[in-house]
Amino acid sequence: MPRTRSDRGQRRAEIIQAATEVIAERGYRGATLSAVAERVGLTQQGLMHHFPTKEALLVAVLDARDQWDMASAALRGQAWPLDIVAELVEYNATRPGIVQAFTVLVGDSVTDGHPAQPHFRERYARVRAGGADALRAAYGDHLPGGLTPERAATLLIAAMDGLQIQWLLDPDSVDMPAAFRDFLALLAPPPAPGTP
């Protein structure tokens, strides 16, 4: 009996989950297609039927991570309020393998012709828009320093990505969640005159 589309979708979901686990255990470089294939009971060739390259599989893992992150925010009733963004940074501190895979892939994707480049262009456009919405909900059309939410969203993402890199390089010295909350505090309006 031929496999149905839902069977293939289920198998792809199993592969993505296995890849997420392998990345968490071994890191980006240690996560091989053969290790993922073994985890789901496939040959490497069988896995490559679903994901032809390691990059394609890792992009699918990152897509699944993004979907989960957005669904978690939606369950709380709003799309990306700033406190949930801070919680996401805190959660990322518990999954270094996924953060490492993201960082390596996004770095590689800046080269011409990289297969993940369209994915990351679209992702960053979507995340900038979501960040701008979160900032607009918190501050209105201008932040205390005068920036528009759109301009500030670019800085918000730069802070998140930059903190991830610093944390990956020196996790004992960089408290990523605390540093991100410090960044958000910089966006807060200045205290009213006469307030301590």
Q: Where are the model-predicted features located?
A:
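Helix-turn-helix
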Residues: R11-E14, A18-A60
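Amphipathic alpha-helical packing segments from all-alpha helical-bundle domains
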Residues: A73-Q78, P96, H114-G140
